[in-house]
Amino acid sequence: MWTLSTENAVEHLHFAGYWPPHVPAQARMLTGGVSNMVIRVEPIEPSSQQPSMILKQSSELLRTKAEWRSRLDRIWIETETMKFLGDVLPPQTVPVILFEEQENYLFGMTDLGQTCDVWKLLLLEGRVEPGLARSAGLILGTIHESGLRHNESLQNGRLADWTVFDELRIDPYYRTIAKVHPIIAEPIQQLIHQMEHLPQKTLVHADFSPKNMLIDSENHLGLVDFETAHWGDPAFDLGFFLSHLVLKTFRAMRLGLPTREEFLDMISVFWEKYQDTFCSVENARALEYRAVQHLAACMLARVDGKSPVDYLAEADQDSVRVLTIEAMKNQTSRLEAFILTLKDRFHQETD
């Protein structure tokens, strides 16, 4: 397998015919993820009409402190998911695939983000955008609803294989925190069992996170990174996404930003739009229960799993442990109840 780098990317594109030979270009590595080599190739001359391009190559060894590996062919799960979602989501929401090189586990795609902001960075600055939360609810609801409507074409083949989801989520997140905190080993095993045996599965993104959401000048939300997609439980997406909003609420409080309540209000905005969009779910109350449990598990995993967040103070990490372990032990079933408990904890810490 040929290995992509900033030093050879432009030459490779010229040689393969993916970039015009008369257009000088430069390559720049994009940071933020841990699992792939991602490079932006763009014209050197700003006046050039040639659009920039994103190259992505799968890496077996992830860039984390703890050793973490995943199979190379997960990149074809990503391209398959992108092709499907490109047809069901609004234009410019998902990049368009330009070429694929099977032997190099590499593909090229259109660039959504050259002039975009990453929503994660806006949240870390304390910026509250209810409109983006609503857009996220619409997009995730559409993914889950469209998955159900196309279940015959999606539930077989690559998306039915959970190997990558296990390597990148179940093991480094759930099994890891169960070992660190044996008191929640049984609830965690129950979550895994529910995901595996859920009667009504759908397309699950499994990396639906503000770090993978690009915001343009008109507040349009673009979505990237689909390698963990699979045919599974939509509640995982809900818990995974909401965990990011809640964890950033801890940060906002610690920094003294006047946005704590507004951060939590974004959760309600997201949840309402999601429920309006994913209307084919068989048991909405059961989905909410599983979503709250995944929310607690994902929050704890970002403190004590293999890929912890780097923006929480030690005291906040302890608060996350107490809150989430309690929610899993008590089997908290309503999102509103979880948020009320969170608000009470915030008030206790500020009194």
Short names for language-model regions:
Residues 1-27:
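Juxta-kinase regulatory segment immediately upstream of eukaryotic protein kinase catalytic domains
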Residues 30, 39-151:
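ATP-binding pocket architecture of kinase catalytic cores
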